[in-house]
Amino acid sequence: EELQMAAVTAAMVKELREMTGAGMMDCKKALANTDGDMDKAVEYLRENGMAKAAKKAGRIAAEGIVKTVVEGTKAAIVEVNSETDFVAKNADFNAYVEDVAAQALTTKAADIDAFLAESWNKDSSKTVADALAGQIAVIGENLKIRRFAQLEEANGFIASYIHMGGKIGVLVDVETDVVNPADRKSVV
């Protein structure tokens, strides 16, 4: 074990951290267990992350944030929960939830189980559930995609807003013949 650890350089650990977002000690351990093979270390971290995610699955995720995305005549809203408010304010977690919202905009899934089983838009080799497990491993808390909804309005527009620092989100469907975005304020 000592010889393996010596072969792992700080530069290798840094590179693996940048590739995966995993913690320093996890990256060091992965490289040591795979004789410094970067590809095998990534796979080791992925498998280890799934195991960590499974261990955290029983913990209550009662905090979290709501994100919305509006593109043209279509919109989506998602709620993703975390265990602590601290994580809910984390920039990486927020970016992940934005990705989940983008996924929800294009999904054909009727419920959460179908949503989790579909191919992840950001990496088609993974499912949404795989991406979630990866985030759980990186962030170190149980996370849960609690719910999502889509809205489509062909004869008007959709607006969105977020209340209370991401705790409450709203999609508003406005049916109107006003098509110019600059004129929409007069409608609402």
Tell me what each language-model feature is.
Residues 1-4:
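Short, Lys/Arg-enriched N-terminal segments with co-localized hydrophobic residues
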Residues 6-188:
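N-terminal assembly/interaction segments in proteins that build large macromolecular machines
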